[in-house]
């Protein structure tokens, strides 16, 4: 998929000051999927409220890819941080990880395009992100707003 406004939004948002460390903390501490967080935030920017059923559908279409591709590549890249002279290899793995995340977001965007639409809401960001946090299953996920 060549045109994906979700991916464009995610790249722009991730580059903002403070966003990357906050996203990584939410990922590492609470087990939240940063791509799903960006999806919720992107929908909020469009003034669309994320529903439980819609999020469950998104999770269903990305779960295998995330489990089989994205997470193993991330773990592999993180293990290569322990090898001091392997920056080139680590960068290649990071590139593959980003391509896998792009594919995940392409799948998410395709799901969005195929959905019946989401209800309009004025400033639904907090609600959308709280719903994503509740899907993580982490007992303290409700506190993620502090990060």
Regions found by a protein language model. Name each.
Residues 6-27, 113:
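Short amphipathic alpha-helical segments and their helix-coil junctions
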Residues 71-72:
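N-terminal intrinsically disordered, cationic/polar leader segments
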Residues 1-6, 145-147:
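Short, low-complexity, intrinsically disordered N-terminal peptides in bacterial proteins
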Residues 57-68:
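A non-catalytic, amphipathic alpha-helix used as a structural packing/dimerization or gating element
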Residues 21-59:
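N-terminal interaction modules that seed assembly of large macromolecular complexes
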Residues 78-147:
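A charged, amphipathic interaction segment
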Residues 31-35, 43-48, 66, 98-104, ...:
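Short alpha-helix boundary/capping elements
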């Amino acid at each position: 998929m060549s045109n994906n406004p979700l991916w464009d939004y995610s790249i722009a948002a991730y580059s903002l000051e403070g966003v990357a460390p906050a996203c990584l903390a939410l990922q590492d501490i609470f087990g939240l999927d940063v791509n799903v967080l960006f999806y919720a935030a992107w929908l909020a920017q469009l003034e669309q409220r994320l529903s439980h059923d819609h999020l469950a559908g998104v999770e269903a279409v990305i779960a295998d890819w995330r489990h089989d591709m994205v997470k193993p590549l991330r773990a592999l890249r993180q293990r290569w941080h322990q090898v001091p002279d392997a920056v080139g290899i680590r960068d290649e793995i990071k590139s593959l990880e980003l391509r896998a995340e792009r594919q995940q977001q392409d799948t998410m965007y395709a799901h969005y395009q195929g959905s019946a639409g989401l209800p309009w809401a004025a400033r639904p960001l907090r609600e959308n992100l709280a719903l994503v946090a509740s899907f993580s299953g982490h007992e303290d996920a409700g506190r993620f707003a502090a990060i």
